[in-house]
Regions:
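Short, highly charged, low-complexity non-transmembrane loops/tails of multi-pass membrane proteins
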Residues: 239-271
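Functionally important transmembrane alpha-helices
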Residues: 8, 12-15, 170-229, 233
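Aromatic-anchored segments of alpha-helical transmembrane domains
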Residues: 3-11, 91-99, 158-167, 200-209
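Membrane-interface capping segments at transmembrane-helix boundaries
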Residues: 54-61, 232-252
């Protein structure tokens, strides 16, 4: 599954380090079909991840393709803001490390016209959706269902993420930084939607600001607004300790935090145990025994 979508990227990264990877260039004739290819690949990746996970009894929601949920099943908007805030901070920190250590990067065409901008936007969307769905959600949930330990899951997921960013050379260390934070956020909430959104806008902003510099200013203000929203939501939940804490989706068998063995982390099993306990308690009360 991973090789189907990322093997070519690993090879391209190696060619980039060797100085042999050609810079993509052209107009609508080249970038138009490439844009369609990126969007098609995105849809296929999500469909395959959902279908293969369903064969293992993991629903799309359990996989993480849904917003963060609170204990009552409602959408946890505050959790989403804080996830995005932490993800953005991780990308900034990781990006700084990569910038300091990188020995190479993917080339870009000298003329960045509308055709290239559209392609870059589609590629950014594909990166956010495909990477977080395959490299994060699908890989982590599969390893957890296989009974692998937390260190094994984290190491494998980070290694997969670093592999197709090999064109940075030593700068790939920065990728490991934000990849680790993304894994923590996913395990903590059981959702990848905020991570997809942040990843898309991070990559997209890098491309857009090269053509429209004012987008960088807008991105800064949006980042500040996100931080404020995250802090306000944290303060609001902290001031109301009586409210149930935000958690992952109730059906997240293999992704909800804390890390546990798959058999013990199945909420449906816990629910059945509680039901049996209540039934036994009622039987004892009917016979005059203490419940």
């Amino acid at each position: 599954m991973f090789a189907a979508f990322f093997a070519a990227g690993i090879v391209a990264g190696g060619e980039t380090l060797a100085g042999r990877y050609p810079v993509r260039s052209g107009s609508w004739a080249a970038f138009g079909p490439a844009t369609i290819s990126e969007l098609t690949m995105t849809g296929v990746a999500v469909a395959l991840a959902v279908l293969l996970s369903a064969r293992r009894g993991v629903t799309a929601r359990s996989l993480g393709l849904g917003p963060p949920r609170n204990a009552t099943g409602g959408i946890a908007a505050g959790t989403g803001f804080r996830m995005a805030m932490w993800a953005l901070a991780a990308l900034v920190a990781g990006g700084a490390i990569t910038a300091l250590l990188e020995t190479g990067h993917l080339g870009q065409p000298a003329v960045q016209d509308n055709a290239y901008t559209l392609y870059a936007t589609a590629a950014s969307l594909a990166a956010g959706v495909v990477e977080e769905t395959i490299v994060l959600a699908f890989a982590v949930s599969t390893l957890r269902q296989a009974g692998r330990t937390l260190p094994e899951v984290v190491i494998v997921a980070i290694a997969l993420r670093m592999s197709y960013h090999d064109y940075y050379g030593p700068g790939v260390v920065g990728i490991a930084v934000w990849a680790a934070v993304f894994i923590w956020l996913y395990l903590r909430t059981g959702s990848i939607i905020p991570l997809i959104i942040v990843h898309f806008f991070w990559d997209g902003t890098i491309f857009w600001t090269q053509r429209w510099h004012w987008i960088g200013v807008v991105a800064v203000y949006l980042s500040i607004a996100l931080i404020i929203a995250g802090l306000v939501s944290w303060w609001a939940e902290r001031s109301n300790r009586g409210r149930p804490r935000s958690r992952g989706p109730g059906t997240a068998t293999y992704t909800a935090w804390p890390f546990a063995d798959p058999g013990r982390s199945d909420p449906s099993q816990l629910d059945r145990q509680r039901e049996r306990g209540r039934d036994h308690g009622g039987d004892r009360r009917e016979h005059g025994q203490p419940a």
